[in-house]
Amino acid sequence: MTGRRAFLRAAFAGGAYAVGVAHGSAQTQGGRRMPRIIVCDVNETLLDVGALEPHFKEAFGDGRVLQEWFATVLLYSEVATLAGPYSEFASIAGAALDMTASARGVTLSAADQNRILQGMLTLPAHPDVRDGLQTMRDAGLRLVTLTNSAPAAVQQQLANAGLATFFERSFSVDAVRRFKPAAEAYRSVAESLGVPVDQLRLVAAHAWDVVGALRAGCAAAFVARPGKVLYPLGPKPDITGPDFRRVATLIVAAEAQQPPR
């Protein structure tokens, strides 16, 4: 259980961010629309959750169980938002791991749990991420993160992946106790940064995250990693690319050419 305790300690630690809803229109400067602030999702968008597959192979005999587990984590984060009560992401991850093991008739050892849950804090960045972040930073774009993970957990994740220095701030849904894609999660970032919500552009590899951001009033860009597709019944982002590097290039071009509103 050491891994679970470490994950939970990281999740419970850290400060809260300001909560609220930002209204108003996009900011302009010198008659032109100011570039949006880029809000990056973390798990699967920046960090490679697939790095946990060997641990699932060892624990379950099939590395593909990783996807079943992570889908369960996301499902029950939505249950916590829609039906309550709120539980932080690490607790849901641990509960989903227990559910997955029970459903498959597997008894997980403490070592198995440790490797999987501790592994969430040490995920590597996708190979295309660093170049993409550098491209946007070189263009003068402001970069922040928004994640379902708790504040201290994401700080560890970004530091361990070598990405922390790219971001001016990291935001967590813990501030509003409602998981993405709830509108409050995105709007709390705008409130904390002191900008209208349409001054934000989410970058994510999850269709549900893109839909949530667009419905909240943000712009969005979709990273169509292998196996990731947009939701056909939802609003569509103006930027889609096959990898983070390409999406970053498209974002720079789009934000440089935005006319005033």
What role is predicted for each listed range?
Residues 24-28:
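Boundary at the C-terminal end of the N-terminal hydrophobic targeting segment
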Residues 112-124, 129-159, 171-173:
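Substrate-recognition element of Asp-dependent hydrolases with the DxDx(T/V) motif
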Residues 10, 134, 150-151, 155-261:
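Asp-based, Mg2+/Mn2+-dependent phosphohydrolase catalytic module
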Residues 32-33, 139-141, 193-196:
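Glycine-rich phosphate-binding loop signature in dinucleotide/nucleotide-binding domains
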Residues 77-115:
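A metal-dependent, Asp-based hydrolase signature
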Residues 31-74:
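Active-site neighborhood of HAD-like aspartate-dependent phosphohydrolases
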